Amino acid sequence: MAKISILFMGTPEFALPSLEILVRNGYPIAAVVTQPDRPKGRGKQLVAPPVKIAATSYQIPVLQPPGIKDPAFLEILEKISPDLIVVAAFGQILPKTVLDFPPLGCINVHPSLLPRYRGAAPINWTLIHGETRTGVTIMYMDEGLDTGDILLQEETPIPPEENFGILHDRLSNLGADLLLRAVRLLEAHQAPRNPQEDSLSSYAPMLKKEDGLIRWSEEVSTIANRIRGLSPAPGAYTFLNGKTLKIFAAAGIEQSVPGQPGEVGKLTDQGLQVTAGNGYVVLQDVQMENRKRMNVSDFLRGHKLSTGTVLG
């Protein structure tokens, strides 16, 4: 029996395992739709999205419409006529004309346990809020923001040492495995469909710069979770002598401490102690504005930072 034809829509690295698992398992990818190339770096050279690079290596046709409602794209969609559309971190909301097109519908790989953490940045906010469990949901797409019925869902614990980068990669691979199971169920016309419980929903909006600002009066666990939820990118930050200091790794020690919030204490084997609301945050990896990321011991060799200096 011939496998179903799939139109794949995705853009960043998160989507790569999902595309790759479909290709490896012999599913015909009619085309890949991804965001346009964007200028990056100091030279502002155009850089292709990771999914475009992967699709080109597989010799899959790539479409980069300026907008998903572009009439030219809709014409191509009619010509391609896929059985199923698979979406993984595409970056645009799909209109009803696209959602209604494929006979098997549109499904999305979402890195949270829906209905919790609907939105653009679920992995970041899951960590920032100190959750100990998360997962991946394969959902049928509708016109809402991650509100469609659930096809499959898998839960996984979050170890305390995992940051955004580690959890991102783990969920992208978990999502790919779950996607393959979902596609096979759809192919066999055995896919379940369970409505989300809207009363349990929460949102994970797109990150803003101020979401990375460390408030030293907060509890150490709150600060440590913000740091891990934004590491390695975009990075939680504070200020030192008017310049941005990004913090990528830190630990929290809850104890009664002297000094005001943000006050620099001593350097220990674990890192540099900074006073917070209910203890110390111990800085381990940092990056000064316009400098490279480094461990805090190397940083202190190049920056004179005396005890009593206040960050923020």
UniProtKB/Swiss-Prot annotation:
InterPro entries for this protein: Fmt, Formyl_trans_C, Formyl_trans_C_sf, Formyl_transf_N, Formyl_transf_N_sf, Formyl_transferase-like_C_sf, GART_AS, Met-tRNA-FMT_C
Record Pfam families: Formyl_trans_C, Formyl_trans_N
Protein name: Methionyl-tRNA formyltransferase
Role description: Attaches a formyl group to the free amino group of methionyl-tRNA(fMet). The formyl group appears to play a dual role in the initiator identity of N-formylmethionyl-tRNA by promoting its recognition by IF2 and preventing the misappropriation of this tRNA by the elongation apparatus.
Keyword Manganese: no
Binding site for (6S)-5,6,7,8-tetrahydrofolate: 112-115
GO molecular function annotation: methionyl-tRNA formyltransferase activity
Keyword set includes Protein transport: no
Family as reported in the entry's similarity comment: Belongs to the Fmt family.
CDD domains linked to this entry: FMT_core_Met-tRNA-FMT_N, Met_tRNA_FMT_C
EC number: 2.1.2.9
Enzyme class, UniProt record, top EC level: transferase
Keyword terms, alphabetized: Protein biosynthesis, Transferase
Catalytic activity: L-methionyl-tRNA(fMet) + (6R)-10-formyltetrahydrofolate = N-formyl-L-methionyl-tRNA(fMet) + (6S)-5,6,7,8-tetrahydrofolate + H(+)
GO cellular component, one term: cytosol
